[in-house]
């Protein structure tokens, strides 16, 4: 999914995760095909043969994918990071884009100038603009700023298509930046620490999604039952810091997260408190058992909600960092406050700090429509309650507490299909 053509051809005998959406004609074509793909008896990364012929629009021609100069330029970048340079060059050339915005997360900015030079060298007559504002996640895609700067194409790196390309205000290309790792150590570690026959739910960030799917048949041959869960519309196995699938503790023995850091894993732990969670760091090659203080988190959030119920004036913060803020969610909360005769003030912020809000001391409660984890992780540091939209609806009596509706489990579904990060205009009209 997104690999350049030469990689697809080179890996024609290997597996890859199934695409989420397959058209009827493609499905019929596949059904008529007698070609079978055998699992590779290997513990190295398993990338897959394409399950369908790429559309002409997306298929990278050999004059790009096999260009020795382009391949030499790609060698300047880490070999285990797939920046999909040929695909990007092809998209720029075919779209006629002249001014291209490049948006990277902090950890990949060190490659930004190299990628910029490569693209301008092989796409004559174009210029690139590296966007330097902080990018925390897929919700921070900044098509608004890119458009305001006169760009006609935005290339967003290392996050999935949280904001669909038919919604962004300019043409957008998502580059997942698949990271290849040697999985032999991971397999050996799991075999040494987990009993065969156990059921493992594997999750991770989008960079390791292909690896997760490649691991499944290998782990199953080793005697494990492997589940790759999904919370739509995210990809199977993909989790975000605010969005993760809900699993059955009766069916899942372990939750395994592939990736560095805990931020995304904590989302899955909050949503699945009774399932033991483990994290495999592919960089340090360590497997660790992870824990989370659910009692403390629930207490802090309930205290904030209780304090908000007596607040005489509210403040509503709409996050302006990329696409974090949803205006429809804001309008819905405004409507509920108006119904109850509660005065409020609106505030537009790209980043939210305690000192900034403390300056407006007449506001007794804040609800931020930006990142739920800001309230969950750092809400205690703010002088007034800082609620998520979900918590605001509880405080206003619109929704019941998670103890009643989710059997005591705090939901992490902000960007799920019906999550509050995706509020539609119709939801506001029905209030």
Swiss-Prot record:
Originating species: Emericella nidulans (strain FGSC A4 / ATCC 38163 / CBS 112.46 / NRRL 194 / M139)
E.C. number(s) listed in UniProt: 2.5.1.108
Swiss-Prot/TrEMBL catalytic activity: L-histidyl-[translation elongation factor 2] + S-adenosyl-L-methionine = 2-[(3S)-amino-3-carboxypropyl]-L-histidyl-[translation elongation factor 2] + S-methyl-5'-thioadenosine + H(+)
Pathway(s) it belongs to: Protein modification; peptidyl-diphthamide biosynthesis
Protein name in the entry: 2-(3-amino-3-carboxypropyl)histidine synthase subunit 1
Annotated compartments: Cytoplasm
Lineage: Eukaryota, Fungi, Dikarya, Ascomycota, Pezizomycotina
Family: Belongs to the DPH1/DPH2 family. DPH1 subfamily.
EC top class named in words: transferase
Principal subcellular localisation of the protein: cytoplasm
Molecular-function annotations in GO: 2-(3-amino-3-carboxypropyl)histidine synthase activity; 4 iron, 4 sulfur cluster binding; metal ion binding
Sequence segments annotated as region (Disordered): 1-57
GO cellular component, one term: 2-(3-amino-3-carboxypropyl)histidine synthase complex
GO biological process, one term: protein histidyl modification to diphthamide
Function: Catalyzes the first step of diphthamide biosynthesis, a post-translational modification of histidine which occurs in elongation factor 2. Dph1 and dph2 transfer a 3-amino-3-carboxypropyl (ACP) group from S-adenosyl-L-methionine (SAM) to a histidine residue, the reaction is assisted by a reduction system comprising dph3 and a NADH-dependent reductase, predominantly cbr1.
Subunit structure: Component of the 2-(3-amino-3-carboxypropyl)histidine synthase complex composed of dph1, dph2, dph3 and a NADH-dependent reductase, predominantly cbr1.
Domain of life assignment: Eukaryota
Cofactor note: Binds 1 [4Fe-4S] cluster per subunit. The cluster is coordinated with 3 cysteines and an exchangeable S-adenosyl-L-methionine.
Gene name of this polypeptide: dph1
Compositionally biased tracts (Polar residues): 28-47
Keywords, sorted A to Z: Cytoplasm, Iron, Iron-sulfur, Metal-binding, S-adenosyl-L-methionine, Transferase
Cofactors, names only: [4Fe-4S] cluster
NCBIfam families per record: diphth2_R (TIGR00322)
Positions with a binding annotation for [4Fe-4S] cluster: 139, 242, 371
